[in-house]
């Protein structure tokens, strides 16, 4: 359903906010703080026309009936590694047991995304984003680069052999830095 255009969209992520302004240029996107219940209460009280939240968090809390729309990766590029689960163990312990849980495609995608973000010094609060997908023997990666100097952002894509996923992420980030500056 479409949002009420007279009230702002609530969002706590600069990365999502940048992309929302392109999706809904006629709408105000306003920062929202507080835990999930506080944010939902503000929505229910009419302060916002909608909230942009991670669906996984709502599902985990049994609140998926509150979800009215999902965004595709083409609409809102996710943070690197979003949706990928990791299992860690101390060195030398349980590696063989845990190896059966590893999905090589997810691992390659995660390496590409993390490499992109690392080159750009992106962190949890930085609006840098990357999404990689493995199809067959190829890795397809899309990156969002935010230029701090003027707060413009750019999205580019590349692809290559999945065995070089990490290098693909690094190369995309370096190319975007060269092309768009800092």
Specify the residue positions occupied by each region the protein language model found.
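A conserved helix-loop-strand patch within extracytoplasmic ligand-binding domains
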Residues: 1-27
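Small-molecule-sensing regulatory modules
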Residues: 17, 22-182
